[in-house]
């Protein structure tokens, strides 16, 4: 992204791509659970549902109402339930209920890519850059909202920590994850050091993932995110 003059574009997955995958799995005797990015952020969920119409009882689509690592931990939870011996229908029922307990929050390092994507004006981006403004965002009811803004990375990190503390506590019996964008996890490691008290006995072995191209395109490098189930 840093080396690109133009911002890459993102697009949804077509029904035909889903149908090809469904047919292959069902023909092999498998039952399929599809967990998608929030339907409020992408048309991919609708594509998955359209393709599933001919596979009733064999393909189940779950709208995660989330994205990136928030979507990831819902999938990981589904795999936990499968190992416990639940049927596909039972897993889907639990995921539909538990997805509302996921908190996904992030700290952005720059406003530049929100400007390039047309989500904020060049003037706002310029002023924010001059003042070292760091936005803190979250996925709420399937949409990305601004929780607040902080001046400087340290204040931004503290803001994110306070927002996590406001939640009902991390349920460590379920999957959780920290993530970052860019080629370096330096900012994430600083955040982990500052927020070590939040992760209790897991601080030295935290699951970490990159946030992926779709979200990374919109937020730019240097973003830090957390996703967890509340108690």
Predicted feature locations:
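N-terminal glycine-rich anion-binding loop in soluble enzyme alpha/beta folds
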Residues: 1-13
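Mixed-charge interfacial surface used for oligomerization/domain docking
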Residues: 4, 30, 40, 44-60, ...
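Short coil/turn segments at secondary-structure boundaries
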Residues: 12-16, 174
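N-terminal glycine-rich phosphate/adenylate-binding segment common to multiple enzyme folds
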Residues: 17-45
């Amino acid at each position: 992204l840093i080396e690109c003059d133009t911002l890459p574009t993102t697009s949804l997955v077509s029904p035909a791509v889903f149908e090809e995958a469904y047919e292959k799995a069902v023909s092999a005797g498998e039952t399929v659970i599809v967990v998608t990015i929030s339907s409020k952020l992408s048309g991919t969920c609708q594509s998955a549902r359209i393709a599933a119409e001919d596979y009733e009882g064999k393909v189940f689509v779950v709208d995660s109402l989330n994205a990136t690592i928030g979507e990831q931990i819902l999938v990981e939870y589904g795999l936990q339930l499968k190992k416990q011996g639940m049927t596909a229908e039972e897993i889907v029922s639990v995921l539909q209920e538990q997805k509302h307990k996921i908190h996904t929050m992030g700290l952005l390092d720059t406003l530049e890519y929100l400007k390039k994507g047309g989500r904020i004006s060049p003037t706002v981006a310029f002023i924010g850059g001059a003042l070292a403004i760091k936005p803190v965002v979250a996925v709420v009811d399937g949409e990305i909202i601004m929780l607040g803004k902080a001046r400087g990375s340290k204040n931004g990190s503290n803001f994110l920590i306070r927002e996590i503390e406001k939640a009902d506590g991390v349920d460590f019996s379920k999957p959780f994850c920290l993530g970052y964008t860019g080629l370096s996890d330096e900012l994430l490691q600083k955040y982990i050091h500052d927020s070590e008290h939040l992760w209790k006995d897991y601080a030295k072995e935290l699951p970490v993932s990159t946030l992926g191209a779709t979200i990374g395109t919109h937020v730019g490098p240097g973003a830090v995110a957390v996703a967890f189930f509340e108690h």
